[in-house]
Amino acid sequence: MFDISFAELVVVGIVALIVIGPERLPAVARTAGYFLGRARRYVDQVKHDLHEEMELDSLRKLRDSMHETVNSFENSVRSEINKIQETTETQSAVIPDKQPPFEKAAENIEPVNTSETKTSSAPAEPRQPNS
């Protein structure tokens, strides 16, 4: 990280021992280690946040491209549906509605007048088939 060799660390340690003194050197070393650890965690957190933000940005771009694709597909499907509806509307306007055959037959049937029909009191007998 700082590119400090072992010899340079020994020189820094000897200077710190002379300047700070042997009584306060452990407390100063602990405090320095604590602040270096905090600084390292802070840098790691910033790196993590940047990496996460870059991933989110790429995911947003992917989402936007997917939305564009879905919208274009939806528009093409809607246009095809509209074409089909227009075609069926023009064809239904050209071809007149036909009545179903059973309704035509019902119109041609004349009502039977029950007063004119004869009823017989004798029971009906089956007819012999012709041979």
Swiss-Prot record:
Q: Where in the cell is it found?
A: Cell inner membrane
**Bias type Polar residues, positions:** 71-93, 111-131
List, alphabetically, the GO terms of the cellular component aspect. TAT protein transport complex
Protein topology in the membrane: Single-pass membrane protein
Its Gene Ontology biological processes? protein transport by the Tat complex
One family from Pfam that matches here is: TatA_B_E
Keywords of the record? Cell inner membrane, Cell membrane, Membrane, Protein transport, Translocation, Transmembrane, Transmembrane helix, Transport
User: InterPro entries per the record?
Assistant: TatA/B/E, TatB
**HAMAP family on file:** TatB (MF_00237)
**Summary of the function given for this chain in its UniProt record:** Part of the twin-arginine translocation (Tat) system that transports large folded proteins containing a characteristic twin-arginine motif in their signal peptide across membranes. Together with TatC, TatB is part of a receptor directly interacting with Tat signal peptides. TatB may form an oligomeric binding site that transiently accommodates folded Tat precursor proteins before their translocation.
The entry's family comment says: Belongs to the TatB family.
Q: What is this protein called?
A: Sec-independent protein translocase protein TatB
Q: Per the UniProt entry, what species is this protein from, by scientific name? A: Nitrosomonas europaea (strain ATCC 19718 / CIP 103999 / KCTC 2705 / NBRC 14298)
The UniProt gene name for this protein comes to tatB
